[in-house]
């Protein structure tokens, strides 16, 4: 075991798969010589060579097209969209081509592409850099979408993503890159895509969340427990497909739920979670499902995000409202 940041854990996972499989290729804007904007791929080109870890032109659509072509020829491309806001430039290649390969070929071809994308608030980026677009990607048939909440999950989920025979969007919250360390096994391991993690068990209310909001939810749970409430916190880990069985089982136990996301409120992952609970756990609910999310506006830039991002106080307020209903 080693103490790692999320950047180190992702780098370790990439290194593991480059060693294990000669068909794994890593490419994107600045990922080679410079090791990426956040130095996530630092040292990989030097160790594995320019044929396997390389820079591309500043053309996201070209990166996606390259990944598609390599995938159907038997490679396992790991492509980076430098900031998730730039995914609009390559959306046709991802959702219109890569995601549909198995379907269009009648199962004779697959596209084992891993699409890495830094996203999320808390680091005061320019506009169109931090956008939470997981909801759009999750609504694209053929894609799996995973979002690790810390170093341990980051390594295990990335190895699973690269080994998947179908495309996986692997989203990396920028605030989590170096904000804390966890014990991470130095040997290889995988975490099942599509399986949520019960981060903390409780009996009075279920807080269901993912990404950076896991940390905020854990802080909120700690404060709520000082007031005598027993709080369960569930980290979805994967937002497509959602682990419906785990969240339903939790709500059937607690009778109350708050769904937390950093993204805008409408038509996102949180809305999908609420819909699933309404269909499958409605008779267990003792209060309306609470929701915590950002406002339905364009993502603000730099310091303005401080008043836009949900935080632990928002979660505590909504949880108490639900508990006292």
From Swiss-Prot:
UniProt keyword Oxidoreductase present: yes
Catalysed reaction equations from the record: N(6)-[(R)-lipoyl]-L-lysyl-[protein] + pyruvate + H(+) = N(6)-[(R)-S(8)-acetyldihydrolipoyl]-L-lysyl-[protein] + CO2
UniProt-listed Enzyme Commission number(s): 1.2.4.1
Keyword annotations from UniProtKB, A to Z: Oxidoreductase, Pyruvate, Thiamine pyrophosphate
Cofactor(s) the protein needs: thiamine diphosphate
Residues that, per the record, bind thiamine diphosphate: 60
InterPro entries: THDP-binding, Transketo_C/PFOR_II, Transketolase-like_Pyr-bd, Transketolase_C
Gene3D superfamilies membership: 3.40.50.920, 3.40.50.970
Superkingdom of origin organism: Bacteria
Gene Ontology MF term list: pyruvate dehydrogenase (acetyl-transferring) activity
Self-association and partners: Heterodimer of an alpha and a beta chain.
Function, in words: The pyruvate dehydrogenase complex catalyzes the overall conversion of pyruvate to acetyl-CoA and CO(2). It contains multiple copies of three enzymatic components: pyruvate dehydrogenase (E1), dihydrolipoamide acetyltransferase (E2) and lipoamide dehydrogenase (E3).
Protein name, per record: Pyruvate dehydrogenase E1 component subunit beta
Gene name of the record: pdhB
């Amino acid at each position: 075991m080693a103490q790692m940041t999320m950047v180190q854990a992702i780098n370790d996972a990439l290194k593991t798969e480059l060693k294990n499989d000669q068909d794994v290729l890593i490419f994107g804007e600045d990922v080679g010589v410079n090791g990426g904007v956040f130095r996530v791929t630092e040292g990989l080109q030097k160790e594995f060579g320019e044929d396997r870890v390389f820079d591309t032109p500043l053309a996201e659509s070209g990166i996606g097209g390259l990944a598609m072509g390599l995938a159907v020829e038997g490679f396992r491309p790991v492509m980076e969209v430098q900031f998730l806001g730039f995914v609009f430039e390559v959306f046709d290649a991802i959702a219109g081509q890569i995601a549909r390969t198995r379907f269009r070929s009648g199962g004779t071809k697959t596209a084992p592409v891993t699409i890495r994308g830094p996203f999320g608030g808390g680091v005061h980026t320019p506009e169109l850099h931090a956008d939470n677009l997981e909801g759009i990607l999750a609504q694209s048939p053929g894609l799996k979408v995973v979002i690790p909440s810390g170093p341990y999950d980051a390594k295990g989920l990335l190895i699973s993503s690269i080994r998947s025979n179908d495309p996986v969007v692997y989203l990396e919250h920028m605030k989590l890159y170096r904000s804390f360390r966890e014990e991470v096994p130095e040997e290889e391991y995988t975490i099942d895509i599509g399986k949520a993690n019960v981060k903390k068990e409780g009996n009075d209310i279920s807080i269901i969340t993912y990404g950076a909001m896991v940390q905020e939810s854990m802080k909120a749970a700690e404060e709520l427990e000082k007031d005598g409430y027993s709080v369960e916190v569930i980290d979805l880990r994967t937002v497509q497909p959602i682990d419906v069985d785990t969240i339903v089982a939790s709500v059937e136990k607690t009778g109350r739920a708050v769904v937390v996301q950093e993204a805008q409120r409408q038509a996102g992952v949180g809305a999908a979670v609420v819909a699933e609970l309404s269909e499958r756990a409605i008779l267990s609910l003792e209060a309306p499902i609470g929701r915590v999310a950002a406002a339905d506006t364009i993502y603000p830039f730099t310091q303005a995000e401080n008043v836009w991002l949900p935080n632990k106080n928002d979660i505590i307020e909504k949880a108490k409202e639900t508990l006292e209903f």
